[in-house]
Amino acid sequence: MCIRDSNGINGTQALKEVSATKVSSKDFCHYDPALNDKIGLFGQAGSAQSELKNNGVGIGDLFLFFGWFKKTENPKIDIHKIFGWLQIEEILEGDKQIANFLKKHKLSHPHDPKYRKYKNNTIYVSRKNFGLFKKFSKKLVLSAPNHKKSMWQFPKKYFASAAKKKSNIFLNRLKWKDNRKLLVDTNIGPGQEFIFDAQEVPDISLWAKSLTEE
């Protein structure tokens, strides 16, 4: 992790405020997804990649990336929030494909086999429309108010009808905790690949579009 000043905030101090006391200036982060370069890239491997592949994730599908965010001035406030997106243009499978692509486009990525060997190594390459949400918006917050951060609440406009009909929204591990309040508990063991079926429920695509076009 490269710890530098950002917008007047010292990186080392910010990490200490969120209890990341074991991080030093000599540590490096696994920068993935990489959404700041000319081509967006997202690496997966092992069982996580198998889960995506087995559920039919492919060309044209959209990743919405979420993370854990804290307000450093008040550590008691923490949320899950969407921070970026990537629509799949190409899927690179295996070390040879990945290495050749990165070399051709003069890109660096932690899934480059010269850095580390991964089982089932895969990189998802973006279409031109990808990026980071650089401004805070309540629309990007997943955590439900007055709940732990892992309890998500989805917007009524896009999810209420499908939840009421008990449509098959979730393709893998998620399920409704309370379909009337549109609550889903994501604290269900290891893994963070949550796959939604936008073919079954087209309103999911409209929700994603409302975020990425904001």
Feature locations, PLM:
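Extended repeat-based interaction scaffolds and adjacent low-complexity, acidic/S/T/P-biased segments
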Residues: K177, V184-E214
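Short N-terminal edge-element motif at the start of the domain
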Residues: I9-I79
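Glutamate identity and glutamate-enriched acidic tracts
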Residues: E17, E51, E89-E93, E193, ...
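Short, small-residue-biased leader/transition segments that mark boundaries at the very start
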Residues: M1-I3
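Aromatic- and Lys/Arg-enriched surface recognition patch
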Residues: I77-T186
